[in-house]
Amino acid sequence: MAVTASMVKELREATGAGMMDCKKALAETDGNMEEAIEFLRKKGMAGADKKAGRTAAEGVIAIAVSDDKKKAAIVEVNCETDFVAKGDDFKAFADEIAAIVLATGTVDVDALMNEKMANGQTIDEKRREMIGKIGENMAVRRVELVESNGTIGKYQHGEKIGVVVAMNGGDDALVRDVAMHVAAANPSAISADDVDQEMLEKERKFQIEQAQDSGKPAEIIEKMIDGRMRKYLQEITLLGQAFVKDPDQTVEKLLKASDASVSNFVRLEVGEGIEIEETNFADEVAAAAAAVKG
C-alpha cells in the first residue's frame, strides 16, 4: 500500500513521533495504522518529538581517552531529572557516545546522531528509544575532541563536571592534578595571551568606572586599574591561579618545576548556560486544570 501524507499526519498526531519515523513505520506495516503505532512503540519512537521541547538541564559528562593518551573525547548528555541521570542505562548511553566520538572523530552533534552504536542502532534511534522507555527528553548537547603530542589526562567530579587536559612533559599524576585544578577553579584560559579581548575590554571598562568614583588623581587611578587588571588575569587564567592543592604556588610554577606545559584544556559542567523556566506550584496546578478542561 502506498503511504500518503495524510496517513503520516494521522500517525504523527497519534504518537508524536517524527515524520520520517512515521513514514518508515507505515511502510514496514503496509499502511496498517495499528501495527504502525505498535512498531513505533517497540522502537521507542512514539512521543519522542513531543518531549523534544522540554528542558533537559540534568545529565552527565562522559569522557573517553585513547590507550596511548594522545586523544580524548568529552561529551555532555542531558536529561530532565537527576534521578534518570544517575541510572546505569543513561550513564552507559553517554559513555558509549564518548567512545564513538573518540573512534570516529565526529564532533558535529547533528552528524554524530547518525553514527552507529554497538547494537546497530544510530545514536538518535537509541536516544528516541530511551525517551519512549523512560519518558524524559534527552539530548547530546556538547561534544569536544582533544588531541596532544604529549599526554592527556582527565578528571571527573562525579558525573557533573568533566575536564580533559593536554600536556607536554610531566607525568600522569601531574596532568591529573592540573585537570582536578581546572575542575575546581574553572579558569577561562591558559594564559593572559589566550584571554578573549572582548572580555578584557569589558572588565577594564568596569574597573575604570569603579576607580573614577574614588575621586583620586588620574595617575593614581591608572595605577589602580593596572593593578586590578593584573589581579583579574591571575584569577581567570590557569597559569596565574593558585594551585588548589598548594595555594602557596601558582599552577605556572607547578608546571615549570616539572618542565611541563599545558597546550589545551576543556571543562564541561552539566547544564551550564541552560535557562530553566521556573514555574510555581499554583501555575502548575492551573496549567494542569486547563489541560484537563481542554
Curated annotation (Swiss-Prot):
Keywords: Cytoplasm, Elongation factor, Protein biosynthesis. InterPro entries: EF-Ts_dimer_sf, Transl_elong_EFTs/EF1B, Transl_elong_EFTs/EF1B_dimer, Transl_elong_Ts_CS, UBA-like_sf. One of its GO terms (cellular component) is cytoplasm. Residues 81-84 are annotated as: Involved in Mg(2+) ion dislocation from EF-Tu. Signal peptide: none annotated. Gene3D superfamilies: 1.10.286.20, DNA helicase RuvA subunit, C-terminal domain (1.10.8.10), Elongation factor Ts, dimerisation domain (3.30.479.20). It is found in: Cytoplasm. Its main location: cytoplasm. GO terms for molecular function: translation elongation factor activity. PANTHER family: ELONGATION FACTOR TS, ELONGATION FACTOR TS, MITOCHONDRIAL. Associates with the EF-Tu.GDP complex and induces the exchange of GDP to GTP. It remains bound to the aminoacyl-tRNA.EF-Tu.GTP complex up to the GTP hydrolysis stage on the ribosome. Belongs to the EF-Ts family. HAMAP family: EF_Ts. This is Elongation factor Ts. It comes from Hydrogenovibrio crunogenus (strain DSM 25203 / XCL-2) (Thiomicrospira crunogena).
